[in-house]
Amino acid sequence: MDKLLERFLQYVSLDTQSKPGVRQVPSTEGQWKLLRLLQAQLEEMGLVKVTLSEKGTVMGTLPANVEGDIPAIGFISHVDTSPDFSGKNVNPQIVENYRGGDIALGIGDEVLSPVMFPVLHQLLGQTLITTDGKTLLGADDKAGIAEIMTALATLQAKNIPHGDIRVAFTPDEEVGKGAKHFDVEAFDARWAYTVDGGGVGELEFENFNAASVTIKIVGNNVHPGTAKGVMVNALSLAARIHAEVPADEAPETTEGYEGFYHLTSIKGSVDRAEMHYIIRDFDRKHFEARKRKMMEIAKKVGKGLHPDCYIELVIEDSYYNMHEQVIAHPHVVDIARQAMVDCDIEPQMKPIRGGTDGAQLSFMGLPCPNLFTGGYNYHGKHEFVTLEGMEKAVQVIVRIAELTATRKGK
């Protein structure tokens, strides 16, 4: 699996951080570099129908090597890394045969500690790939890309029976835009899997319903010495708004199937302020209730303001829970589960406290659960992946292809 590690290190060396609030897709030039590289590599591997769309989606097909009416399936990963933390000049550290304890991240005081991340206790003896403490790693989702590419090479080299295998690499997943421009008809798969999960065994087909909230506040600034009855402090209004949001329903206080409100940024002055929230919930009714709650808060805080001062709230849905779409096609999950069992992996089916391209694609007619990559602690300097986990992901992808080859016409 040396080639697997080589691919991964090549992909993370490219800065593909996406950027929110940008109309163009992909949102950054760096993503194009990786997309063009993947297009060239797929062509070099001999895949057919290799394309790169104007919106930055790479697609290709590994043709079937067996006859019969075998359903075409797909595997999908995204090229962008999170805007939450720098993805520039990623300098991975390779820790072979991890023996426990803290791992120094570069030169300085940053460490990857089992005290903060107890999962490390389960990874003794494995090869860990970490950051140097200055950037994220990019295992989300370049581990998935490397695993798909390696699985394709494995299917070819070992002549393992399979039907048509479609692959796709998308941009801007981290800012919720990649799948919006995905051509499901051109992809032409019966179903697919995103390879964008976490630890070994994760098999996910439930995710958050998600929305973004933008609150713009216009106040009135005058000299503080003569401000009584005249000044309207936009920052004070912002503070009042956040005080109304349930403090016990935040990311840091919730888990499992619990939803939350998350203030992601706030900026401004006395004159103007802007707040950005994200809303998440697995239950659609609770999701809608959370959106109504934000509207009620804005209305309450804005009541009685001078006509020239106001609070403007815009809510935009990002994606929905794929569960209802995927369970209508139980074999899609069953095959992945069986593939894991066949690879001596215990499937861990739990909800995604996040989203994937697969959530949107499932609502576009392409059932698309999520498979593990072997990575942990995404979107920050403590991100890492295990080589053994990546190898397991490759095995599962290959086994899914092999099992699907036995489902003629189904």
Curated annotation (Swiss-Prot):
Zn(2+) 1 binds at H78, D140, D196. One of its GO terms (biological process) is proteolysis. Keywords: Aminopeptidase, Cytoplasm, Hydrolase, Metal-binding, Metalloprotease, Protease, Zinc. One of its GO terms (cellular component) is cytosol. Binds 2 Zn(2+) ions per subunit. Its cofactor is Zn(2+). The keyword Oxidoreductase does not apply. It is an enzyme of class 3 (hydrolase). Pfam families: M20_dimer, Peptidase_M20. The keyword Kinase does not apply. The active site is at D80, E173. Belongs to the peptidase M20B family. This is Peptidase T. The gene is pepT.
